[in-house]
Amino acid sequence: MDNKLLLEATNTYGSPIYLYDLEKIKSQLIKFKESFRSIGDIKVQYAAKALSNISILKFIKNLGCGLDAVSIQEIQIGLKAGFKAKEIIYTPNGVSIEEIKEAVKLGVKINLDSIESIKEFSKNFPSDSIFIRINPNIFDGGNDKTSVGHSESKFGIPMDQVDILVEMEKANKIKIDGIHVHSGSDISNIDSFIKGAKTVFNLAFKFKNIKYIDLGGGFKVPYFKGDTHTDMNKLGNKIGIEFNNFKEEYNKDIRLIFEPGKYLVSEAGVFLTKVNYVKEGAKNKFAQINSGFNHFIRPAFYNSFHEIENISNPRAKKEKYSVVGYICENDTFAENRKISKINKGDILCFKNAGAYGFSMSSNYNSRYTPAEVCIFNNEFKLIRKSQEINDLLTNQIIIDL
């Protein structure tokens, strides 16, 4: 998306806004599938948590993907977007049996990650088969908050508890037809993926009727020129060798599943904001924008780096700025970053904002969530309106005091 197009979007819809390029999502999916060509027909379950706008989900569904959902609400939105229940895998963590029952009623595939929840599930649904999520004891990922496959993580069934499930299956107390592993986000080390895959392949021999192996997601995309990222072709070749050897030995038809989220949508999205003031501080020069971590929390929460470009004045000499928001605490997006000279009213573009941007936004400070816009067939499409005051008050009740 060129700067002229981005500026046109802010002229039409105002700012701040999230803007998504649907063709980029499509091209990322094609690249992803091509990386695993040695395996054949892989199953792609898009991770809805990355970006769950219903129009984006509909587009991804039309590309032939299934859906990875982590909440009953993601399931419901997915169904409204057009996914069939059988195309959705539900992978909750620590939810109540009531929510799981609701998911079963909707007809989606259940993937559970604790002995406790599996035992309760088997009492209620003894004839239903499930996936199980394993904790492979792998510590990797771009941030401690997103590393979810290590021994101290709340996610997944520890390896030393797997035999409990083997005995449950032998006693016909549970039916297991899929094994799932997901170690984290922003993993560039291919060996971590291979270790997770080998762990699951070896576990499959303990069970009688495995039909699916789900290797999750977590593929790292580059955030700036020269940044590390997952070498997808290299990973695909290595996974292909391991999987084809495993399938030959297992001697049953097994389908491989992946759950890309960020890989598909991160680079397809930008976040556009306007500069309210350029403030001279005691030591720093601040670019104060009309947004905060209520809209885009990744830099504050994950300490993530996002390129920031002044698209109103891209060829100007670069100066150092700390880009900050309007929230009542230190919501710093970038500190002493070299950016083309910034003036009041300029539009700043945050790159790689398609994943975990809007989906992690909030109404902190009673601020409105921003609009979402996509580009489809060379046209802008508004896919979410910015909030208004009534949106903040809709579910509140004023009582007599």
What are the residue ranges of the model-derived segments?
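Active-site loop/helix belt of alpha/beta enzymes
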Residues: 136-277, 339
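Glycine-rich, aromatic-flanked loop segments that form ligand/cofactor-binding clefts
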Residues: 127-139
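Active-site-proximal loop/turn and secondary-structure-junction residues that shape catalytic pockets
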Residues: 48-52, 73-74, 94-96, 114-116, ...
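Structured core elements
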Residues: 66, 89, 111, 131-133, ...
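Conserved, mostly hydrophobic/aromatic
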Residues: 25, 49, 71, 103, ...
